[in-house]
Amino acid sequence: MRTFILAAAVAAALTRAAFGENPPADPAAPAPAPVNETVVVSATQSSEIETEIPGNVTVVTGDELRRRNVHTLADALEDVVGIDTGIGSDNGVQVPTVGMWGLKEFDALLFMVDGVPVGGPFNPNLSQINVDDIDRIEIVKGPQGTLYGVSGFAGMVQIFTRTSEKGSHVTLTGGSFQHGRLDATTNVPLGTGSLRLFGTFDRTDGWQDRTDGRDDRGGIRFDQALGGGHFSAVFNAIRTTQLWGSPLPVDPPTGEVIPGFRVDRNYAVDGARQDHRVFSLTTGFDKSLSTAVTLVNTLSYAHDDQISVRSFVDPGSVEDGTVASSGVSLKPTEEALFEDFHILANFQGAGSHRLVAGAALTWGRTVAAGTGFDFTVGLDPIDVPALGDIPVGDHRSFNDRRTFFGIYVNDEWNPLPWLEITAGARHDWVEEELFAKGQEVGDPEAGVSRDSRSDAQWSGGLSGLFRLVGDKSGALNEANIYVAAKSAFKPAAPNLTEAESAEILKPERTRSGEIGVKTRWLDRQLSFNLSFFHMIFENLVVSTLGADGNPALVNAGKERFQGMEIQAGYRPNVLPDIELIGGYAHHDARYVDFTFIDPDEGLLDASGQRLELTPRDLWNVKLAWLPASGPGAWTAVRHQNHRPFDKINEAYMPSFYEWDAGVSWSFSAHARLSFVGRNLGDNRHYVAESEIGDAQLYVAPPRRFLGELTLSF
């Protein structure tokens, strides 16, 4: 870390000597946001210009998503530089797994909506995210434990939803695989406040056999001036019925598809599904006590009744055109309560300070009961039995309760006009109690697992931002160098489907260093950002085969993630409706110290090997021309090089390109017609690996088209 700090200090000194000093007149007075600059909240819990943040931050606007007909979280994030994602995961055919810095673990990232973690203290519940209601997405890379606690220990994605606005909007969508969608929103003045009503109805047959989906969601948002401050309340109701599709079994030594299996065929039990019935209420209140101090409070409760039925084949059991399969049917109920209270304060003391201090509580409970079952699948032709026709093999249940409480403080100090030092610390208390039971049919005794764990640990961060060139006209308008060091921890998530074998694993911890430069050129028409990162991850939870041949979650010792990311954007002043954005990322993600026992091959050492399914090099380019009226068009291309298939890197998956494009016509401020094609090259690459089914991968959806008509009045 001293190397990072020394490099930043030397670079700052040399560059300031070359360009000369150009400090702002008054460091205590916040500068207004420059033209074409993005304001970010997530990185510091207060409004900050992106170039003034000592870290890698990207913002995607909801208007941009709607103009590109985006309705899934994967489509919303896939063109962000360095983000590795795709549609499909253990949690459903429409639910992605998202990777940053080469880390693609489902629970490694914090996902928030309006300041509230979706899923509470458990794994991110991405089905709760309403993509149609997004105002903007803020992606902050690297550990965020200081401000956001144990869930933000490797990076975060925060979604801010739309507030009250004038008028009403209706969008009709139709496309491939019998996809139909209706989205409507209206805004109603209510005294001195405002009321916003919104709803979405979505139907699709799915591209994989027996993966029909129905997604109905709606809500109410109320905003009101109250007690000299601002109060908001958002109620959401979600009813998602998603038939579940199985991943594709692959041979570990070669990476080839197991003979007899085919892409887009569904080998899961007939009746497999991932359903959610969610009710949530989030309230927010902020009040300025003075020009220098503001109070902010967020309170949320969510209740999710689920139906989870999944099954996975045993690739090694293929014989005479059949394969053995096992599955679990559960009805979990998940509750989550979240409360955060903090103050924002600006004051003087050897320079200007912006202080954030507060406390947060996250509580959650998941209770479930269900059955396990075994059956046989016919491969050619496919013959899959219905869930109700399969004998019950065992009964299982679990009760998992988690409580996180943390106090935190973070200070941005400007001792000099050209220097900002940010330091923060957080202390978290974590408690978890787990009870799981399983009983085989015919066995008079049940297997019981009781486990509990308490931890109290610190997270923190220290960073410096050096303003080399500040808000000048001409060729180089702004140049900032930053260096940051951060550390965070989180409790590991048990695999609750393992019944009596479920256990609480060791907490995971990250330590990272980052150095970067952010520049603006040609009167802010051109942006160029460059960052280097290094992160050590201890006790990463991975899936391996247990002694019984079934997948099990284990701690994986130590991993190292390092690399660099470049992002450039160009928006000419003479053609402000045209935007060109591109970037390149180099991610080197490796096991540092990890050995495990394979039931067939014995002790294996993955130390020094790359993490499976993580690309070393990935790049993307997007060109858009989207004027407010008249014709518009856009296209986006992304690429990933070959990726290791297994933990000891015996086989690699081929590199791939993916291409999307769309055209539109805005007839006026009241009507817009658009057509979009995704994965136009029909590349069926792998997007994620199952953490439950051994050596089984989810495949990218095929070429598909979408037409959309939006009416505003």
Model-derived features: where do they sit?
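Gram-negative outer-membrane beta-barrel transporters
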Residues: 417-421, 525, 532-536, 554-647, ...
